[in-house]
């Protein structure tokens, strides 16, 4: 999330105006830090703090779902030192924010492919998901090693396997079938998309859901 975000007191929003699902592309952290002659990792650290504040505010407002684009499947081209810090920051964030999630009745969900993530990060993810599974408030969905095209490909593979095993009939496939096999199955489509760096592109994020 762009570290330039300043959290000001939010005016009360009429219940009928509150979005059900907010999706945020968290970019601009490294550039924010570089403009201030700071290392890129400083920007990522401040971005994590902004994510915490926004998550708490969404929980306060009663927003059902908040999806944060934390790490794109295309981010692996970054320097190894930066990637190592991002993995460390992610694991640290998930542990430190457990109390916050429990206090605010937040349930954690994580989407994306796990194949390139360190085992330590996966373990922390699973522990945090299990710990918050009984919470009934805002669903905080973190997109980690996520790509919208990969999500659709994975959904098609699941559907193809079900057709092959005759669990699913080709003629019965419709849009809802695809939605049910996406990483976000069970979630509503976003009705508000925010890109913190202000760029006007979606960067392979929730392609099916926001179309």
Show where each model-derived region lies.
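Flexible, compositionally biased loop and terminal segments
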Residues: 1-211
């Amino acid at each position: 999330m762009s570290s330039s975000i300043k959290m000001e007191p939010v005016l009360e929003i009429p219940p009928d105006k509150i979005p059900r699902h907010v999706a945020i592309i968290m970019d601009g952290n490294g550039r924010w830090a570089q403009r201030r002659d700071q290392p890129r990792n400083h920007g990522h650290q401040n971005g994590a703090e902004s994510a915490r504040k926004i998550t708490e505010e969404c929980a306060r407002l009663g927003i059902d779902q908040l999806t944060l684009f934390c790490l794109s499947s295309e981010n692996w081209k970054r320097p190894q030192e930066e990637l190592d810090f991002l993995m460390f920051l992610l694991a640290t964030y998930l542990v430190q924010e457990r109390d916050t999630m429990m206090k605010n009745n937040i349930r954690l969900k994580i989407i994306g492919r796990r194949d390139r993530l360190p085992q330590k990060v996966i373990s922390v993810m699973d522990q945090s998901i299990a710990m918050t599974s009984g919470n009934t408030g805002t669903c905080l969905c973190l997109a980690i090693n996520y790509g919208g095209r990969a999500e659709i490909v994975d959904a098609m593979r699941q559907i193809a396997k079900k057709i092959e095993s005759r669990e699913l009939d080709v003629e019965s496939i419709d849009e809802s079938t695809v939605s049910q096999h996406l990483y976000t199955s069970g979630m509503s489509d976003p009705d508000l998309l925010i890109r913190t760096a202000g760029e006007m592109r979606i960067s392979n994020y929730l392609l099916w859901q926001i179309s």
